[in-house]
């Protein structure tokens, strides 16, 4: 499932027209409705180059980004270095990931879940999400 190998280096340019700020505002509204407020911990599954992860961090959340594409995480790390933010990125597959600690919420946007095409794989994702969320935690995906 390494769909973005090589493409990572032009991904942000290609996705330049995407209203990430609006998406993040929408996510923050939904998270707050569920009691997940800034200062809480979020995991971003399929974080790619880290754009949404960085926006959530700027909104006050403590973030960890997970992606299975090394090139995408390389770009995310470069952007992180430039921004001075403190975000943990982890090279893992969303079908089989472990977090170092439970989080209050997980998000997966920009069609990341569309790459999960079998019933077994979607079950694996949801099992990992359940294991990684604190009791009462929230999972928002598109």
PLM features: residue spans?
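Conserved class I S-adenosyl-L-methionine
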Residues: 1-46
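Class I SAM-dependent methyltransferase SAM/SAH-binding core
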Residues: 51-96
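A short acidic, Gly/Pro-enriched loop at the edge of an enzyme's catalytic core
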Residues: 98-105
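Residues lining the SAM
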Residues: 109-111
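A short His-aromatic
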Residues: 114-116
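A short glycine-rich, Lys/Arg-flanked "PGG" loop and its adjoining helix->strand segment in the class I
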Residues: 123-135
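Conserved beta-strand signature within the Rossmann-like core of class I S-adenosyl-L-methionine
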Residues: 136-142
């Amino acid at each position: 499932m390494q769909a973005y190998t090589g493409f990572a280096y032009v991904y942000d340019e290609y996705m330049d027209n995407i209203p990430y700020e609006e998406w993040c505002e929408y996510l923050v509204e939904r998270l707050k409705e569920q009691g997940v407020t800034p200062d809480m911990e979020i995991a971003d599954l399929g974080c790619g180059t880290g754009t949404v992860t960085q926006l959530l961090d700027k909104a006050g959340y403590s973030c960890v980004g997970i992606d299975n594409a090394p090139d995408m995480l390389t770009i995310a790390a470069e952007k992180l270095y430039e921004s001075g933010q403190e975000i943990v990125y982890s090279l893992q597959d969303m079908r089989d990931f472990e977090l170092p600690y439970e989080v209050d919420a997980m998000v997966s946007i920009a069609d990341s879940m569309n790459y999960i095409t079998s019933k077994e794989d979607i079950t694996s994702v949801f099992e990992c999400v359940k294991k990684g969320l604190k009791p009462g935690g929230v999972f928002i995906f598109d």
